Design a protein with these regions (language model features):
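Conserved short histidine dyad/triad with adjacent acidic residue
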Residues: 62-81, 110
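Double-stranded beta-helix
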Residues: 118, 122-171
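A short, compositionally biased micro-patch
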Residues: 70, 80, 88, 114-115, ...
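Glycine- and acidic-residue-biased ligand/ion/polar-headgroup-sensing regions
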Residues: 80-99
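Short acidic-glycine-tyrosine-enriched beta hairpin
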Residues: 97-120
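A short, N-terminal "cap"/entry segment at the start of jelly-roll beta-barrel domains
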Residues: 1-66, 157-171
Length: 171
């Protein structure tokens, strides 16, 4: 069986840790960005590339994101601050984890680890992915919601964890 695209990428970085591999991919994606209009990833915000289609839905204290990802496309997620349910409704998707590369075949769902998850994904087939996230303020402003949900660097994530720990200790 031929290796999927993620295995090819990760095999070229054998001595790096998982986070270092993702950082290397992030740096490469940043280098591909031409300008603010033609951006693949910048490590500072959520990017919704044109090759994917998105549907954003809001329910009471929930944000539901549906993404259609075409076959052959690859994407790097931001760092998730919170655990969330992930549903692959159709297609076949390869996704990196700290344990290795998983091949997910729809229909399948799982709950992400409790924060700090970042994934590199590759659509082996056309995919429809749905994720459900907390939205404690019921905002419909994606930029505001993304500040709550995501970190854009591991340093930012560590600051979030440290602040959360201090807040819990002060209760």
């Amino acid at each position: 069986m031929p290796k999927n695209e993620l295995e090819k990428i990760f095999d070229n970085l054998p001595t790096l840790s998982y986070k270092e591999k993702l950082k290397s991919v992030e740096n490469y994606l940043i280098s591909l960005s031409v300008d603010d209009e033609n951006i693949f990833y910048d490590g500072k915000r959520t990017v919704y590339p044109d090759f994917c289609k998105y549907k954003h839905t809001f329910a009471d204290k929930m944000y539901i994101r549906e993404m259609s990802m075409p076959r052959g496309s690859t994407g790097l997620s931001v760092i998730q601050k919170h655990s969330y349910p992930f549903f692959l409704l159709s297609g076949c998707l390869a996704a990196t984890t700290e344990e290795g590369i998983q091949e997910l075949i729809a229909p399948v769902y799982f709950t992400s680890p409790p924060g700090g998850a970042q994934r590199l994904v590759h659509a082996i087939e056309d995919c429809v992915i749905v994720t459900v996230h907390q939205n404690p303020t019921n905002t419909k402003d994606l930029k505001e919601l993304e500040k709550y949900l995501y970190a854009f660097s591991w340093e930012e994530y560590e600051d979030f964890v440290n602040k959360k720990t201090k807040d819990e200790e002060n209760k």
